[in-house]
Each structure stands twice: as structure tokens, then as C-alpha cells.
Amino acid sequence: MGYIRRPAYYKAFRCIGSDCTENCCIGWEIDVDEDSLAYYETVPGDFGERLRASIAPADEQTGEPAHFRLDAEERCPLLNDCNLCEVLLHLGEDKMAQICTDHPRYYEWFSDGREDGLGLCCEAAAELILAQTGAPAFDVTEADGVSETGTEAETELENVLFSMRDALFRLACEDAPFDDKADRLYRTANAQQEQYDDLLFPFPEGEDEDADETDEDTASWSQAFWRESTLTSLLELLLGFEINKDDWRTLLTGAKARLPEIIARRNDFLQAYQGKRHEYDNLLTYFLYRHFMKALGDDAVQDKVQLALVSTAVIQLLDVYEWLAKGEVTHWAQICICKAYSREIEYNEDNTEQLAAFSVLDEME
């Protein structure tokens, strides 16, 4: 019997349906899984015909799966004028495509269990993520449907990474200024990468494995990140990604135009919003929980921490821009910035890989 691990807030999540301002049936190409597709072929009557006409078949040449065709306004054709799903209304929730049932939930499978989470792109999920206080809490349950399939070596390697991530969680929630915390996380990640490499590729017995202290062991990640040259390069990288919605481009170009002022006034912003600094702790924890264990696939431990640091710092950068532009950062504005970042970055693997590889310290050279 395996386990399922979830953030403690996971069980509180409820889709707000037609009240959502960022409808996940608008602007997203929604794939149709094979089981749902097979069922939809059997639905009778006028609705069945309209349902099938709304689906673009899979393309064997490109590998693109079957998906709902978006209309001219980039809406799912089965989203009615009240922003309610007609599949749900006509056939029931259990007949919705798998991605529609799951979103914004995501799942990561391991040798003897699974981790579930909620994506920051959803405003109801973002509300829960930002609201947490104190150290991150998780619910772990045994699950009949999750089997133990891994080898002892695979499980051991996973446990090493889980332990490393727990250490990062503790650092992320320390009562310390954001920059000090970011520097400690970066240095810890550098040490963890060395430990992980030693585990995977141990030195032959008798060979000296001690290494001299490197610049990365002592460098200030925050000092390097908050330089105008670094932020200019980073924003240009973000603007070069495929952009889904214009509000994201507007945020990035606005921030880029005011970088000197953002850098100069950032400490004033952090002082003014000191009561909400736990939100950045929560974001660090969220990005670490969602992405760190992917190091099992590429052994890039440090890159996963870099992704969490850059992601959280970019959101903070946009918060400062919002504060300068409008005189305040409302709770709703913070949710909008977070969900825009997640929508534009986290659901494109190329984007996350490039941000994870973006070398902040190299920008100082």
C-alpha cells in the first residue's frame, strides 16, 4: 500500500465555477483523454453531435492529442453564456474530460507513493496558498490505489531528496529578511547538489574528494539578482517566451521600464508590506514542493531551488511595480500577479527549464 501526500490546505479547495475571473475553459487548449473520447463517441442526440463536432481529433504526425476546438474568443465551445460547462450540465461531473476534472490539481508519482498539489494559476488555489501561516503542513494518508512499485535504490534516492527538500522548507519559513533567506537557500542548494552528486558518483576509495570553496559557496544570490543588468536580462527572457495573455506582457514591459525605480524603492515596499512577507515564504514553499522532486529525472538539485528563488523574486518584482504604479498592492492584485506568473510559466516545460538554468551569478561577471 502506498501513500498520498498533500498540502494541508488541499482539502479546503473548492472550484468557484462561474464566479472565477480566470476561467480555465478560456484561453487554454483542453486535451481530451482517450477514455473520455471513447465515451463521447457514444453520447446520443443533438448534444452528442455538438459534443463530437467540438473536438479536434488527435494528429498522429505532430503527436498533438485530441482537444476541444476553441472558438474565435478562445472559449471552449461547450462553455455556455453563464460560464458553466455543458458536459457537466448534460452528462454529469464524472463525464468531464480528465484534465477538466483534475485542474488545477497536479500529481507527481514516486516509487512508493504520490504527491498531489494545487496549481497557483487558479485564483481559488492562490488564495489558499497565500493565506498559510507558519511552517508548511502536509497530510499523508495510505492509499489502496497507489502501489509500491520502485526498487529499494529508487526509494532510497527519493528519501534523500525528500530530506533535502524538508531542510529547504525550514529555511524558507525562517523569521529572516527575504534576501538573507534567499542567500541561505541558494548556498544550501549548492551544498545539496554536491552531496547528491557524491551519492550518484562516489569518488574511488583513497581519492581526495575535498573541493576548494567556490564563489557559489559564498556569493550573495540576492545581491546578484537585484542588479539592473540581471533583471533586464531576466525580463527580456520572459518577454521572449510564448505569451498567452496580454496582461502578462503589460506587466513585464511596465516593470522593465521602471527597473531603476523598482530597485531603489524595493526596501521601502518590503517595509510597508512587512505584515505580508509570509506570502513570499508560502510561494517559496509552493515552488519547492511542486518542482524540487523533479531532480529525480535530471539530477539538477540546485536548478530546482534556483527556479523557486527566481519565481518568487519575479513575483516580488512585479509587486513592487504594482505598488509604484498604483500606490498599493491589494490582496486581489497579489492573487492576479501570482496566477499570471503560474499560467505563463509553470505550464510550459521549456519555460521552467530556462528559468531554472538562468544563472543569476553569471550576470555579475
Located regions from the model:
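Short runs of predominantly hydrophobic/aromatic residues within well-ordered alpha helices
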Residues: 17, 21, 161, 165, ...
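A structured, charge-rich N-terminal accessory region that forms the first stable segment of a protein
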Residues: 22, 26-59
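Internal, well-ordered alpha/beta segment that forms a basic, Gly-enriched binding/recognition surface
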Residues: 83, 90-183
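Immediate flanking context of iron-sulfur cluster ligation sites
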Residues: 2-20, 55-97, 114
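General secretory precursor processing signal
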Residues: 18, 23, 27-28, 79, ...
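Short glycine-rich, low-complexity/disordered patches
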Residues: 51-65, 180-185, 328
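Hydrophobic, aromatic-lined core segments that form the binding pocket/scaffold
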Residues: 175-365
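Long, low-complexity, compositionally biased intrinsically disordered regions
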Residues: 2-22, 111, 124-126, 130, ...
